[in-house]
């Protein structure tokens, strides 16, 4: 998932409210686990591709969201393939055997990762960080009754989302500077690699603390006193488009249950 980046657009998902998109993403998670056979996975795969295509986002951004968990997907695939020993033997070479159930589970688990990361990436790329945090604050509003500091939580999320791309860019600059000095972060034993990371972390932490201090000073100078009396440039309103998005999710769930053999 790509966090802190927003690509403006005019697609259906772009024009839906952030509240509806967050509800859609959270409710999509349990639906993924309904896909346990070929029919449900083919349908969910087609739905995910349709969502990606209709968002009109450059495919490189979606692939960028998948890249951080690519190792996890491959690792999970191999683990399921090697340690699930049920069903007919599909391939055998000495001690190495691939079982039918192992291959089935490996494909299903890998696809689940793909579905989840693709949809959450779509939500974050089609929603600006400020809209995302305002929506979270709105969804947390009922918890104000039990004195949960919803505005402060939303503010922390907003600042985190704002500075994650900045810190990532800063990390890349420091890495290039270290490599220019002859530091190789990808070679040698693990102990040496960890030792090579220390010169990378220290300037990164110093930069992060300096940015935090500058931000706190700027907020104080502008008279920030919490969420009391705060107004917003754009108020989030529930529209028929948002209702359509949730109804689409309900239809998806019912169809998955049917294809799974639940009716």
Swiss-Prot record:
A GO molecular function for this record? transmembrane transporter activity
Read off the Pfam families from this record. Answer: CbiQ
Alphabetized HAMAP family for the sequence? EcfT
Q: What is the annotated quaternary arrangement, including any partners? A: Forms a stable energy-coupling factor (ECF) transporter complex composed of 2 membrane-embedded substrate-binding proteins (S component), 2 ATP-binding proteins (A component) and 2 transmembrane proteins (T component). May be able to interact with more than 1 S component at a time.
Q: What does this protein do?
A: Transmembrane (T) component of an energy-coupling factor (ECF) ABC-transporter complex. Unlike classic ABC transporters this ECF transporter provides the energy necessary to transport a number of different substrates.
PANTHER family from the UniProt entry: PROTEIN ABCI12, CHLOROPLASTIC (PTHR33514:SF13)
Name of the featured protein: Energy-coupling factor transporter transmembrane protein EcfT
Whichever gene encodes this chain, its name is: ecfT
């Amino acid at each position: 998932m790509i966090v802190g980046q927003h690509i403006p657009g005019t697609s259906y998902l772009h024009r839906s409210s952030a509240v509806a998109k967050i509800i859609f993403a959270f409710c999509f998670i349990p639906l993924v686990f309904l896909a346990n056979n070929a029919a449900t996975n083919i349908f969910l795969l087609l739905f995910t591709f349709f969502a990606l295509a209709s968002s009109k986002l450059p495919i490189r951004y979606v692939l960028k969201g998948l890249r951080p968990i690519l190792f996890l997907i491959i690792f999970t695939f191999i683990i399921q393939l090697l340690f699930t020993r049920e069903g007919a033997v599909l391939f055998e070479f000495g001690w190495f055997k691939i079982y039918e159930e192992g291959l089935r589970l490996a494909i299903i688990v890998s696809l689940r990762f793909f579905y989840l990361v693709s949809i959450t990436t779509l939500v974050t790329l089609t929603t600006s960080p400020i809209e995302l945090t305002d929506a979270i604050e709105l969804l947390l509003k009922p918890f104000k009754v039990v004195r949960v500091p919803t505005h402060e939580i939303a503010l922390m999320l907003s600042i985190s989302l704002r500075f994650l791309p900045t810190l990532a860019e800063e990390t890349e600059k420091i890495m290039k500077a270290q490599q220019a000095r002859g530091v190789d972060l990808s070679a040698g034993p693990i102990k040496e690699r960890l030792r090579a990371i220390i010169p990378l972390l220290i300037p990164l932490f110093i930069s992060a603390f300096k940015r935090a201090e500058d931000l706190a000073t700027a907020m104080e100078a502008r008279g920030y006193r919490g969420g009391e009396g705060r107004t917003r440039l754009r108020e989030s309103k529930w529209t028929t488009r948002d209702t359509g998005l949730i109804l689409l999710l309900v239809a998806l769930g019912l169809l998955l249950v049917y294809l799974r053999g639940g009716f």
